[in-house]
Amino acid sequence: MAKLSTDELLEAFKDLTLIELSEFVKKFEETFEVTAAAPPVAVAAAPAAGGAGAAAEDAEQKDSFDIVLESVDASKKIQVIKEVRALTSLGLGEAKALVDGAPSTVLEGANKEAADKAKTQLEGAGGTINLK
């Protein structure tokens, strides 16, 4: 097999969809027994807070979110597919498969503003969204 340069690899990755890239990363991690996750950062322990207050604080402090499409109103499925395509730049077939496979992750690692915007758009189109 010919050795590919970094630039050639990047060009090949540009042609892949987000789903294909995600599958590639998983295979890469398994093959080389590595992880693409950032190393954990030590944080000073905060005093324990009770129940929902702690969950709300965690959500406020969190800086990246996964947008999960939990379910779709059957009568608004087409609008949800259009929004998924607009948010992810997936093709029609991939977006339809993602919507049909709910619950499924639409976006991973989005910042708070992007996550809120995506949630608003998808809920407006007829989807039930959960931010994780």
From Swiss-Prot:
Gene3D superfamilies, from UniProt?
A: 3.30.1390.10, Single helix bin
Q: Which domain of life is it from?
A: Bacteria
Query: Known Pfam families for this protein?
Result: Ribosomal_L12 (PF00542), Ribosomal_L12_N (PF16320)
* Alphabetic keyword roster: Ribonucleoprotein, Ribosomal protein
Keyword Ribosomal protein appears in the UniProt entry: yes
Q: Name one GO cellular component term.
A: cytosolic large ribosomal subunit
Q: Name one GO biological process term.
A: translation
Tell me the segments the record calls region Disordered: 112-132
Q: What does this protein do?
A: Forms part of the ribosomal stalk which helps the ribosome interact with GTP-bound translation factors. Is thus essential for accurate translation.
| Protein name (Swiss-Prot/TrEMBL) | Large ribosomal subunit protein bL12
Source species: Leifsonia xyli subsp. xyli (strain CTCB07)
Which gene underlies this protein?
rplL
